[in-house]
């Protein structure tokens, strides 16, 4: 590594550390547990939006369940490839984790057209058929219908993911889909309301 590369890396780290210091100061007192706060401050860092202090909701076992799943080499099922692109695949692969999105698969597209469904719904159904949901981390940042279908698969077809990250953004069904997840016993991390998006899921 050249000196310039080392300096750029150090500069980037200093900028990030400075950003987190600003977040910690401006956020002030909060009721998040330490592990939860690490998530919330990264969401604020990605969005520059302190409203997420009020929007982020955690199941009591969310952090420990997510960490345990990663250490066990879980599947990470995402609704859009943008989330997959933002994850550190090398680091996850070192734990044995695999990142998967079925939303662009030909059979998923065909089924969505045939059933007048959505690709997001059919992608989650495919993941369940293939046995990929049990013990998985499911990260939904774009498609509320994927989140709604995940809840149905849990309630009606005994899917048992380790953690649901439910942060779809939008005006139609986004807020409602998150409320459905909040009613589950399955560990979850949710950004309630309309706000969200793939950068938050990452």
PLM features per residue range, with description:
Residues 1-34:
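Charged, compositionally biased N-terminal leader segments and the immediate start
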Residues 31-45:
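N-terminal glycine-rich anion-binding loops that anchor highly charged ligand groups
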Residues 46-54, 163:
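Short, basic, glycine/proline-bearing loop/turn elements
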Residues 54-69:
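A short, well-structured juxtamembrane/interface segment
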Residues 76-78:
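Short hydrophobic beta-strand that contains or immediately precedes a catalytic carboxylate
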Residues 80-156, 161-162, 170:
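Conserved mixed alpha/beta catalytic, RNA-binding, or beta-rich assembly cores of soluble enzyme
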Residues 162, 172-202:
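C-terminal functional extensions of proteins
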């Amino acid at each position: 590594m050249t000196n310039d590369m080392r300096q750029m890396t150090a500069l980037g780290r200093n900028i990030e550390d400075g950003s987190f210091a600003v977040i910690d100061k401006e956020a002030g007192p909060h009721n998040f547990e330490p592990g939860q706060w690490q998530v919330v401050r990264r969401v604020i860092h990605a969005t520059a939006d302190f409203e997420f202090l009020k929007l982020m909701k955690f199941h009591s076992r969310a952090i420990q369940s997510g960490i345990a799943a990663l250490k066990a080499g879980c599947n990470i099922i995402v609704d859009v490839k943008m989330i997959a692109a933002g994850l550190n695949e090398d680091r996850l692969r070192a734990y044995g984790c695999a990142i998967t999105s079925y939303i662009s698969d030909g059979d998923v597209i065909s089924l969505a057209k045939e059933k007048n469904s959505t690709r997001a719904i059919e992608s989650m159904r495919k993941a369940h058929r293939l046995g990929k949901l049990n013990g998985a981390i499911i990260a939904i940042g774009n498609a509320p219908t994927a989140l709604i279908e995940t809840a149905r698969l849990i309630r009606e077809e005994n899917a048992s993911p380790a953690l649901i990250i439910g942060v779809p953004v939008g005006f139609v069904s986004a807020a409602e889909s998150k409320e459905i997840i909040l009613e589950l016993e399955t560990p979850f991390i949710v950004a309630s309301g309309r706000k969200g998006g793939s950068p938050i899921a990452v």
